[in-house]
């Protein structure tokens, strides 16, 4: 999965961000799936990363995508 998705960060937008938001929602978050990587997506991502034992940097890179799998 990780190789199929680009690195995403605050300010990113598009279909890949929608996929990230959907994955976070499957992990228990309640994000609007709007394709915009705003503050709510960043906060949810950082919380997810923290809970998963990763450095909570708010960037969806290969480790985050692999964990969200």
Model-derived segments and spans:
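Short hydrophobic/aromatic patches at helix-to-coil boundaries
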Residues: 63-69
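Conserved hydrophobic/aromatic packing and binding residues within compact polymer-binding modules
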Residues: 45
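Sec/Tat-exported extracytoplasmic proteins
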Residues: 24-28, 33, 49-56, 68
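Acidic, Ser/Thr/Pro/Gly-enriched interdomain connector segments
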Residues: 1-34
């Amino acid at each position: 999965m990780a190789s199929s998705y680009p690195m995403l960060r605050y300010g990113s937008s598009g279909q890949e961000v929608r996929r990230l938001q959907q994955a976070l929602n499957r992990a228990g978050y309640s994000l609007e799936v709007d394709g915009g990587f705003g503050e709510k997506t960043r906060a949810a991502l950082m919380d997810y990363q923290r809970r998963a034992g990763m450095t909570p940097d708010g960037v969806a890179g290969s480790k985050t995508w692999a964990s969200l799998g």
